[in-house]
Amino acid sequence: MMTGEQLHQLLLDKWGCSYDVQLRKVKGKIFVQVMWKYLEQASFPLSPQEYAENLNAIANYLNAWNGAEQLKSFIEKTRERPRLGKAVSIQVDLGERTSEWIL
């Protein structure tokens, strides 16, 4: 199980910033995308509370998909980092549950 707070700490430990995290569905696959915008930027569109709520929602999806450990492992091992115009995309393997989540 992962909480939004743990996801936030994972981002801080890896990259030192509170990067925005989004879910994307592409060609029947789910990706977690760590975006290049981050909470500490003056132009960041979310308040700290909205940011925390977003991370909690994403953590809840990851837990439902049994994908929290996949995400944690990928972030810990990757050499990629978010940069302007390029997110870090992490595919979440839904296994046999794919049909339940992908319409």
Residue ranges: model-predicted function:
Residues 8-54:
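Charged, amphipathic alpha-helical linker/scaffold segments
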Residues 49-65:
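Short secondary-structure subsegments characteristic of cysteine-rich extracellular domains
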